[in-house]
């Protein structure tokens, strides 16, 4: 069978699966597809509603979402996810990817650096001063929205726009700042895929998210494109480090907390970076490295792409199934679909839709605007969960501002919604903690195992990697946290920390008697401004590395 025919058949199979999923959704949630002008047949629905109350429905949701969160279940899930990590460490081209950042900051680095943070909607430029002893200061900064007009800039025009913003920010510092004979060191936090070729270089590939700047620049060196645009404005800058957001978070927190070995991004999406022994990683994962890189790189920061793990391990409910089956990329990011800001609101919306059909929520009338997928934002979920007022008046006001209700939601409706939001976010915190615990165990296994007994496929005839960690290390660590959900969702970080405490206690107790005061731990620590600060720290570390090399 020819390759094109196989592709056609595969696409037809995907199309058929999506049609089946849509039909299932029509059967389960007919209100999503009902003509709003059609008169409701109250007799039928009246009998249907009497099958269960809102309280009974909430109990079912609670059972389905929280029953996997027993300590025993979470330990088992953690062990299974660890096996997925181990497999991907050896050969996967899409996850557990080693970066070029092998050294962590000591906290003593000093200097003033230009830092850039290019995200999906904002471009930030800042001048950062590192003062040593973990002291970081933003001397000057600017933030520019990346609107649709900017996204449509093709080729070098986008980098020219960046250079204009860089020049504007530096001019606010001093007329000649950035124009001296000695190049100004610059770090870049780049939130898009690149084919990285060194700590300071990478080749442009398709960016997605509506950006067109890769048109005409594919395969060109990213740092050179930025530098050339800056030179056209007589700016003398040099790109010394390129990092992604999770690596930037780890580096920024490690500068002030020497126990930082992991980072967590949890906002619209999620990811984890971890400082990991080189010897435990498959050699093919490294691609082409500079000469001698393996001689001095004992560790490397891994981009785990955590969102892709947990498939077939983390239990799903019928609402998760509908979300997954109707997604453009079903099964692609199992963990992400159940824990992130992009999807928590949609899970709640799907539960609401069924509650309207079967438990008389909102008197059986689903607001028309809630019929659209992803129309129930996670910010509403967070607000509802945080509302402790007796009659939930603030929640009612927000709901009626965002959606049009034929009849105002009752207090019973609002209490049901708050409970559902609490249940959905509780599971998200538990599943995330399970994945983090799994990564912690994986790191401990690799870090404290006998390197002579390593079974990793890193050691090849063509390249021998026998790096042995000589520095004293600890199983206790801090995780740098950034992102709207982990930083701002009420109680989420505390709940996740509580699960981590239980999981680490269980792991510690299984290894024999330990002094509670010295037992290994995981601490979730906020890393504010991590993308921009981490870019500066990455430069400082790279500069120190060049000096020592």
From Swiss-Prot:
Region (Hexokinase large subdomain): 244-529
Glucose-binding: annotated span: 159-185
Cited InterPro entries: ATPase_NBD (IPR043129), Hexokinase (IPR001312), Hexokinase_C (IPR022673), Hexokinase_N (IPR022672)
Gene Ontology CC, one term: mitochondrion
Top-rank taxon: Eukaryota
Pfam families: Hexokinase_1 (PF00349), Hexokinase_2 (PF03727)
Residues of the Hexokinase domain: 54-540
Residues bound to ATP: 110
UniProt GO molecular function: ATP binding; D-glucose binding; fructokinase activity; glucokinase activity; mannokinase activity
GO BP term, example: glucose 6-phosphate metabolic process
Reaction catalysis annotation: a D-hexose + ATP = a D-hexose 6-phosphate + ADP + H(+); D-fructose + ATP = D-fructose 6-phosphate + ADP + H(+); D-glucose + ATP = D-glucose 6-phosphate + ADP + H(+)
EC number: 2.7.1.1
Keywords attached to this entry: ATP-binding, Glycolysis, Kinase, Nucleotide-binding, Repeat, Transferase
Gene3D superfamilies: 3.30.420.40, 3.40.367.20
Pathway in which the depicted protein is active: Carbohydrate metabolism; hexose metabolism; Carbohydrate degradation; glycolysis; D-glyceraldehyde 3-phosphate and glycerone phosphate from D-glucose: step 1/4
Stretch list, region Hexokinase small subdomain: 106-243
Quaternary structure note: Monomer.
Similarity comment: family membership: Belongs to the hexokinase family.
Function: Catalyzes the phosphorylation of hexose, such as D-glucose and D-fructose, to hexose 6-phosphate (D-glucose 6-phosphate and D-fructose 6-phosphate, respectively). Mediates the initial step of glycolysis by catalyzing phosphorylation of D-glucose to D-glucose 6-phosphate.
UniProt-recorded name of the protein: Hexokinase-1
Native organism: Aspergillus fumigatus (strain ATCC MYA-4609 / CBS 101355 / FGSC A1100 / Af293)
């Amino acid at each position: 069978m020819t390759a094109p025919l196989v592709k056609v058949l595969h696409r037809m199979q995907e199309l058929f699966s999506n049609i089946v999923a849509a039909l299932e959704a029509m059967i389960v949630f007919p209100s999503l597809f009902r003509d709003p002008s059609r008169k409701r047949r109250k007799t039928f629905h009246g009998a249907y509603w009497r099958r269960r109350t809102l309280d009974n429905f909430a109990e079912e949701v609670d059972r389905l979402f929280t029953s996997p969160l027993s300590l025993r279940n979470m330990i088992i899930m953690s062990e299974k996810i660890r096996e997925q990590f181990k497999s991907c460490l050896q050969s996967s081209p899409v996850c557990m990817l080693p970066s070029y950042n092998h050294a962590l900051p000591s906290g003593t680095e000093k200097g003033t650096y230009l830092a850039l943070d290019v995200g999906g909607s904002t471009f930030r430029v800042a001048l950062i001063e590192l003062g040593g002893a973990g002291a970081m200061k933003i001397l000057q900064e600017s933030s520019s929205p990346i609107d649709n007009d900017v996204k449509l800039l093709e080729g070098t025009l986008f980098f020219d726009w960046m250079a204009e913003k860089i020049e504007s920010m530096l001019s606010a510092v001093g007329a000649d700042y950035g124009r001296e004979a000695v190049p100004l060191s610059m770090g870049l936090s780049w939130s898009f895929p690149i084919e990285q070729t060194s700590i300071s270089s990478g080749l442009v590939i398709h960016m997605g998210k509506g950006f067109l700047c890769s048109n005409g620049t594919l395969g060109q060196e990213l740092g050179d494109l930025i530098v050339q645009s800056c030179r056209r404005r007589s700016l003398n800058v040099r790109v010394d480090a390129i990092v992604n957001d999770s690596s930037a978070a780890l580096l920024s927190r490690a500068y002030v907390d020497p126990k930082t070995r992991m980072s967590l991004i949890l906002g619209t999406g999620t990811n984890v970076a971890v400082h990991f022994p080189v010897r435990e990683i498959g050699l093919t994962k490294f691609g082409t490295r500079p000469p001698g890189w393996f001689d001095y790189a004992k560790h490397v920061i891994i981009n785990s792409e955590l969102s892709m793990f947990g498939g077939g391990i983390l239990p799903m409910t019928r609402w998760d199934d509908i979300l997954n089956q109707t997604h453009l990329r079903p099964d692609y990011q199992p963990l992400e679909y159940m824990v992130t800001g992009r999807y928590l609101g949609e899970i709640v919306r799907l539960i609401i839709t069924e509650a309207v059909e079967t438990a008389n929520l909102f008197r059986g009338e689903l607001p028309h605007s809630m019929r659209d997928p992803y129309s129930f934002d996670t910010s509403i979920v967070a607000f509802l969960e945080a509302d402790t007022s007796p009659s939930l008046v603030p929640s009612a006001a927000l709901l009626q501002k965002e959606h049009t209700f034929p009849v105002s939601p009752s207090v019973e409706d609002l209490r049901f919604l708050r409970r559902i939001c609490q249940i959905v976010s509780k599971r998200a915190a538990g599943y995330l903690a399970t994945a983090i615990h799994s990564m912690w165990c994986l790191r401990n296994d690799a870090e404290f195992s006998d390197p002579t007994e390593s079974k990793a496929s890193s050691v090849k005839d063509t390249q021998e990697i026998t790096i042995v960690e000589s520095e004293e290390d600890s199983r206790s660590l801090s995780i740098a946290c950034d992102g709207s959900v982990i930083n701002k969702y009420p109680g989420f970080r505390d709940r996740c920390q509580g699960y981590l405490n239980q999981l680490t206690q269980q792991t510690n107790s299984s290894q024999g008697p330990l002094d509670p005061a010295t037992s290994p731990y995981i601490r979730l620590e906020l890393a504010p401004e991590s993308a921009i600060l981490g870019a500066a720290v990455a430069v400082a570390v790279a500069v120190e590395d060049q000096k020592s090399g």
